[in-house]
Amino acid sequence: DATAETNIIQDPEAADRVFHSGADVPMVGLDVTHQCLLGSDATAQWRQQAAPTGVRTFLADIADFSIAANLHADARLFSAGMPLHDPLAAAVALDPSLVECFDLPMKVETETGDFHGTRGRTIGDPAGLIDPSAPRVHVALTVDHDRFITDFTWRIAQLAGD
């Protein structure tokens, strides 16, 4: 679905409950994760540092396959590499300073049609906008791309060892 994020569409009702729970919840949407692309330059570095049959070579092969698949799916959107959706979300959970956020009441569409949007789409909650006590979600607006990519590629290289 073009309007629902993969992790949300798997269980929109659960995601909506999390958004309304009052928990300290960051949301890193596609508009932000698409700012953090892993390109073939990074995988080339992994290959240079790897033993010919090492873990880094294996990880570079997997990443290059994903980069190629994304490029095949949409050459314009993925010309610079593949988005690191889940790695960025995990990194933000560990280090919220990677992103700048705006606190907003959010909801997840759980139905489609009849004045509903598309199931799984995340939107600002109009009811929460008029209720100052409504739970807020930390919606990421920007990311420190350079810091994240540098840290991510370094950590992968360190974990790979070889």
Q: Where do the PLM segments sit?
A:
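Active-site glycine-rich loop that binds ribose-phosphate moieties when present
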Residues: 1-20
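Conformational coupling and interaction surfaces
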Residues: 9, 25-162
